[in-house]
Amino acid sequence: MTLKQYTGTKFYNGAALVKIGAPWNAILSERAAGKSLYYVKECVIDYFNNKRLFAYVRRYDEDTKPKNVDKYFSDVNFTEWLRKGTGYDGIMCSQEGLYLYKIGDSGKQVKGDKIGYVFALNIAEKRYKSLHYDGVYNYIFEEFIGARYIENEFNVFNHLISTVSRRNPFRVFMIGNTIARDCPYLKEMGIDLFNVKPGKIYQHTLLQQNGNKILCAFDYVEPQEKKSLFFGKAEKTVVKGEWDVNEVPHLFFKLEDAELIYTCYFVSEELKNAYKIRVVFYEDNKYLYVYPYKYDDIEYVHNDIFTDTPDFKRKRFIHLEKKRHARIRDLWKSGRVLYSDNLCGTEFRRAMKKYNPFI
């Protein structure tokens, strides 16, 4: 039985990331780079070498239905590799378990060894709490970057791992495409997507309250030039790996030509992003001008909040007084919002979706 990992350069190669040995790993790239294939192989190899099972994790239970899971593991490059190295024909899902299988004489799948489990975060707190999952070491979390997240998702994911692995060691591979930079997972890992560049593996050490250190690794994969039939915005996001953004209104006048009425800030608890908002007056109209506002110590934020006095040293925010808050809401609802760029506008609008007064 021979199972070898991919060592070429045509597709994604995660050997450098795996070698670091971090328990928390995130991989971000353009679509169809081969990263999912690489880490599924990594988990299968670990099973055959060390008998360690893996967990396939998705955000929503729709993606963990057997037909969708079977489709995920049906990649021809994977099944040929598995068949050649082990004699098994693939991986199938049955009652939230993952099993190796062979095709029998009747043409049907014959279930073999259990190799892992499937989990969905949106049902995790109710479904998996009192159950036992022995032997799980690896976790593959697909599409961990999304346009929206479930409530307190990072904590839900941590609790799931705690339920499954208990106090045993584990290794997480979070796999994502370049959809949105406002990702709570990477923020919690100490990775700032505003200050990283493709083509490099970043490492960050987190310090727990008891003094223990946790190593996190982030592989921001360099986009590869490929021939494709996509064009326009799709070409930038699907082929070139650029961030998935929408067209938003930009500042159409010089900021110094407008009258500044006041400045405030918006801080998102879940996404851990901050924005500076200027209320300006230009040619008989008021506008909101929004642009990113970065500061280092943001983990203490406990609410989505508008504030005009962010006291970062004392870690305290003062809410906007009602009149100013109402003015911002009115300008938002009337569509008089301008942004520094499309990426800022896309991310700010996503943050606003969770802020009830603006929905």
Locate each region found by the language model:
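Phosphate/NTP-binding elements of NTP-utilizing enzymes
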Residues: 2-359
